[in-house]
Amino acid sequence: MTVSVGIDKIGFYTPSLYLDMAELATARGEDPNKYLIGIGQSKQAVIPPTQDIVTMAANAASQILTPALKAEVAMVLFGTESGIDNSKASAVYLAHLLGLSPKTRAIEVKQACYGATAGLQLAADYVRVHPQAKVLVIGADVARYGLRTAGEVTQGGGAVAMLVTADPQILTLDMVSSYHTEDVMDFWRPTYRTEALVDGKYSTNVYLDFFKTVWADYQQQTNRTIVDFDAFVFHLPFTKMGRKGLRQILPEAQPDQQKSLKAAFEASQEDNRNVGNLYTGSLYLSLLSLLRHGQLTAGARLGFFSYGSGAEGEFFSGILQPNYQRGFDGAALTTLLAQRKRVSVAEYEDIYRAQLSNDSRDVQLPVGEEVAQYYLAGRQNQQRQYREQ
Ligand code: COA
């Protein structure tokens, strides 16, 4: 008998600062509605130098890992394109910071915004073979395009942590999925750069083309059509992107279903609209947003489109489980977002420039205002100094 496998728990973390997108638009000489409606972003997470992918992942994972679960994690798959080391995996730093058992495999997975999906699917296959195993999958990134660039409005950052197990509380993953890879230069970041190179308009078109391709292939493999779905969840580098994706397939649905799919999309973009781009975590923040704000019932089939520039796309699906609300702490996320402090454009620019320098100097970061459990205190002897409070 095939074991049902999927997402048992989800945790999310984003730092305690944000920038208002209407204010950024005004500072950049743009109509605020371009950012609020045209791009579809209201707030953007501002990442202080005291947070990086490891600390954000630890802050997300600590929400879902009890001491007993920490002893049971068999593998950590850390999806990111914001790596802090060309050799050592961020998953190893994370496993140590969380106090996981040394009997754990810990590796990093990279393919732009697709990394966490690769982690999720590899984790699911592993658990199908080892049904007792629990795998921690992370999607954590800092989305940086640069001050005064076209991509600036699509920045952000944060981490999603998912526990993949047999008989999961939130979502069982269907076995069939459709994936597609092509060598495309729409977005990339050579090792000498701290900001990505991107052709945003081209990337938007590749995203939509890949979605068309994998959606058609998925339907052919499964004989399912749009009527078999209650909601679609998209990778959201900015919320308008997913809206364009949904528009591409809506004509396949009858008017009533179009209405419910649109309502589900509105729920799925709400939290992303207030956090910004998490790169590889974005699809899973959108899932969390749908679970928090949507009107879904157990048994609903959800479709997921994952896209990582460069480029790789995947369409997969899963079934919502009866106790899905027990798999995440919605109230904690509401509090996390509500308690963030708004920074001005000038403050954001200072924080943006204050990121840990790309050299070997010893640095002590100003940790006085840091409220997160895990944070970065600086660098000594070329080693990042992680702390817990
Ligand atoms: N009110 C409402 N909408 C407005 C507006 C206004 N006053 N002014 C402009 N808009 C709309 C435009 O019509 C456009 O909508 P559309 O895409 O539906 O046609 C949208 O706002 C964006 O305007 P545009 O002129 O295309 O913006 P831009 O040249 O500044 O670029 C991106 C936008 C998204 C391409 C750019 O931010 C970017 O490159 N981001 C990075 C993308 C990325 O991360 N890609 C890789 C991962 S998939």
Which residues make up each language-model segment?
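Condensing-enzyme catalytic core mediating Claisen C-C bond formation in acyl metabolism
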Residues: M1-T50, T149-N205, D209, F316-Q389
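Acidic, glycine-rich active-site loops and adjacent beta-strand->loop/helix elements
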Residues: G11-Y13, G79-I84, Q111-A116, G139-R144, ...
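Conserved catalytic cysteine-centered active-site region
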Residues: K34-G38, S42-V54, S82-K134, P251-S282
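Catalytic phosphate/nucleotide-handling subdomain of diverse soluble enzymes
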Residues: L288-L337
